Curated annotation (Swiss-Prot):
Domain LRRNT: 28-66
The protein's name: Lumican
Annotated InterPro entries: Leu-rich_rpt, Leu-rich_rpt_typical-subtyp, LRR_dom_sf, LRRNT, SLRP
Gene label: Lum
Any one GO BP annotation for this protein: response to growth factor
Residues modified by glycosylation: N88, N127, N160, N252
Sulfotyrosine, modified sites: Y20, Y21, Y23, Y30
Modifications made to the protein after synthesis: Contains keratan sulfate.
Residue stretches of each LRR repeat: 67-88, 91-114, 117-137, 138-159, 160-181, 185-205, 206-227, 230-250, 255-276, 277-296, 305-326
Length: 338
């Protein structure tokens, strides 16, 4: 099947995607090493509160001297954390432990909750089977992706927690529903690549970004997303959604800017709000284009704000698109169709 892209105005240069959050190391120039540093690690003199211990084949957390606020321990062989590992640095703010061998049973006591200034805790790519805890109230960013997590502990009292990354785990909807409902500051939640067959109940209504792609979700409860009055980015691609499992106004959310429903089993285009800008519907079973899915009425001031629309990989063809589509989607930059 040949796929062609036709442009209504001008094709945007660059890719279109949702909101991703990139937390790189603090920016600085490497220079003379600080004397306040573990001998096997790197503490640049120009940024003396950061200690880099990446790629050293460490089997345990090294001695961390007082004054360190940003600690990087990526790509090692650390398989345990003693309860006293961070006693000298109770004002630690970032703790990055990605790509190690950590298991829950070998993370001792209240090693994290003692860090009263901790804002970022990253333990991606380890061997965790449940979430870690207890955690300090100061925590803003928790990343536990690419583990084997099937159980979430309590997140009670984490009033500042804003970002949670749980993709590529073994979570089912029951585990999620029981743990996250009290997080009133949560804005970003990634639950993609898990084992959910239903949408989890009780997710925080404060969410701006919600990723649920690559699960086994078959239906959406009526008015499920209406509670999320600020939701902007929603991904449900690579699930098992069919028309019978999607109530008529499931995605008619005025705040929504991007919706990804690609790689499902939809035969008709779900109705969306006129404020939506990016809509991904490729590789479904769409047979017709209904303008009313985008525009309830047409007029000089009534039109869709869609900029990018993907319809390729469906039975729908360019020749079957209705003429009034162009009036409804008048500000679109790019529409991709077979």
């Amino acid at each position: 099947m040949n796929v062609c892209t036709f442009t209504l105005v001008l094709a945007l240069v660059g890719s279109v995607s949702g909101q991703y959050y990139d937390y790189d190391a603090p920016l600085f120039m490497y220079g003379e090493l600080s004397p306040n540093c573990a001998p096997e690690c790197n503490c640049p003199h120009s940024y003396p509160t950061a200690m880099y211990c990446d790629d050293l084949k460490l089997k345990s957390v090294p001695m961390v001297p007082p004054g360190i606020k940003y600690l990087y321990l990526r790509n090692n062989q650390i398989d345990h954390i003693d309860e006293k590992a961070f006693e000298n640095v109770t004002d630690l703010q970032w703790l990055i432990l990605d790509h190690n061998l950590l298991e829950n049973s070998k993370i001792k006591g209240k090693v994290f909750s003692k860090l009263k200034q901790l804002k970022k805790l990253h333990i991606n790519y380890n061997n965790l089977t449940e979430s870690v805890g207890p955690l300090p109230k100061s925590l803003q960013d928790l990343q536990l992706a690419n583990n084997k997590i099937s159980k979430l502990g309590s997140f009670d009292g984490l009033v500042n927690l804003t970002f949670i990354y749980l993709q590529h785990n073994q979570l089912k909807e029951e585990a999620v529903s029981a743990s996250l409902k009290g997080l009133k500051s949560l804005e970003y939640l990634d639950l993609s690549f898990n084992q959910m067959s239903k949408l989890p109940a009780g997710l925080p209504t404060s969410l701006l970004t919600l990723y649920l792609d690559n699960n086994k979700i078959t239906n959406i409860p009526d008015e499920y997303f209406n509670r999320f009055t600020g939701l902007q980015y929603l991904r449900l691609s690579h699930n098992e959604l069919a028309d019978s499992g999607v109530p008529g106004n499931s995605f008619n959310i005025s705040s929504l800017l991007e919706l990804d429903l690609s790689y499902n089993k939809l035969k008709s285009i779900p109705t969306v709000n006129e404020n939506l800008e990016n809509y991904y519907l490729e590789v479904n079973k769409l047979e017709k284009f209904d303008v009313k899915s985008f525009c309830k009425i047409l007029g000089p001031l009534s039109y869709s704000k869609i900029k990018h629309l993907r319809l390729d990989g469906n039975p729908l063809t360019q020749s079957s698109l209705p003429p009034d589509m162009y009036e409804c989607l008048r500000v679109a930059n790019e529409i991709t169709v077979n």
